[in-house]
Amino acid sequence: MRTLNTSTMDGTGLVVERDFSFRILTACFLSLLILSTLLGNTLVCAAVIRFRHLRSKVTNFFVISLAVSDLLVAVLVMPWKAVAEIAGFWPFGSFCNIWVAFDIMCSTASILNLCVISVDRYWAISSPFRYERKMTPKAAFILISVAWTLSVLISFIPVQLSWHKAKPTSPSDGNVTSLGKTTHNCDSSLSRTYAISSSLISFYIPVAIMIVTYTRIYRIAQKQIRRISALERAAVHAKNCQTTAGNGNPAECSQPESSFKMSFKRETKVLKTLSVIMGVFVCCWLPFFILNCMVPFCGSGETKPFCIDSITFDVFVWFGWANSSLNPIIYAFNADFRKAFSTLLGCYRLCPTSTNAIETVSINNNGAVVFSSHHEPRGSISKDCNLVYLIPHAVGSSEDLKKEEAGGIASPLEKLSPALSVILDYDTDVSLEKIQPITQNGQHPT
């Protein structure tokens, strides 16, 4: 280092020193990214292995599969590329082809698992009773197997048979990619056919499915929230009327205005949740797959259309892999997993949770509105049943909604079973985990 510092006057030493500093910063950043990906997904897997109740929910099967694919990205893909980035060349020789296959397989599996989760959540709230009957552990394993099988088929077979490589246009291009890298950097030119077809399967088709499913989820959730809000207004209205009647002044009986604001707040929370899910995924992967389809069309003339700098390409490659570090936060950070993480990390007693005031509005067999309130730790789940924030009873299936719109909207009270209770937790965020199917008696299946 001293020699470098004393030789900066000629310019060469300054370049070397800057390059060394850049490599150190790159190493630190990539190490943190890899460690965070390992920690987050390892915690998800360990929590599922340690706690049986996490394995009892079919939805968590897809979260586990997602965590496994992201964990493989952190083990089989990211470290090797990080070493190559720091060293400036690929030091692992013939392991290159296997690494490329692992890269395509793990990344595709992660994206397909995200797509399966979106379909699972849409089915759960659009047809809750059919979902309860059809979405068995066997059905979940079949969907997961399809996602992983497809990931293997578009990765190992084409790579090992060299179907993914573009044919060199000249003898000098035999070991050079469209990004201007030699085989020492373990980068090979993709053929146009493979680049487009693999991008369609790995990203464009799944992202289209996710956009459709999450858009429909929001529309269903919006209708549910508005109907729940109507129920709340009717319940509070009845309570106010009972109170004023007891005071001898039954004329003053008004509708609460705050219920409209709460309905808007809940709709906003659902929209924010779904926006984060789609926004993070698209921001991480879309730039890479756009470039992935552009690079094979890189021209050889003076203008060289669709050609990009290798550093730019690598940056967006890491952007895509960074999605694996964010998935545990987005998909496995509900109350069940948070409590499991706290127990595994030994901070359950050191991090006491705050309490929320929970108001329960229920309707007994006589049709009377009954109010009760209690306190529960923030993020806790009732032992009797899971909290229902988006009630499939109030929405029904998509077919029921169409019939109802044609024949007139029934009163929200008529949509409720006598034993159904609506849990109102105004401080709790809306997440996909809270969109759950329920049975005929208004309870979650055990």
Swiss-Prot record:
Dopamine receptor whose activity is mediated by G proteins which activate adenylyl cyclase. Interacts with DNAJC14 via its C-terminus. Interacts with DRD2. Interacts with DORIP1. PANTHER family: ADRENERGIC RECEPTOR-RELATED G-PROTEIN COUPLED RECEPTOR, D(1A) DOPAMINE RECEPTOR. This is D(1A) dopamine receptor. Glycans are attached at residue 5. Gene3D superfamilies: Rhodopsin 7-helix transmembrane proteins. It is a multi-pass membrane protein. Residues 1-23, 88-96, 164-192, 300-312 are extracellular. Keywords: Cell membrane, Cell projection, Disulfide bond, Endoplasmic reticulum, G-protein coupled receptor, Glycoprotein, Lipoprotein, Membrane, Palmitate, Receptor, Synapse, Transducer, Transmembrane, Transmembrane helix. GO terms for biological process: adenylate cyclase-activating adrenergic receptor signaling pathway; G protein-coupled dopamine receptor signaling pathway; positive regulation of MAPK cascade; vasodilation. The keyword tRNA-binding does not apply. One of its GO terms (molecular function) is dopamine neurotransmitter receptor activity, coupled via Gs. It is found in: Cell membrane; Endoplasmic reticulum membrane; Cell projection, Cilium membrane; Cell projection, Dendrite. The keyword Transmembrane helix applies. A lipid is attached at residues 347, 351 (S-palmitoyl cysteine).
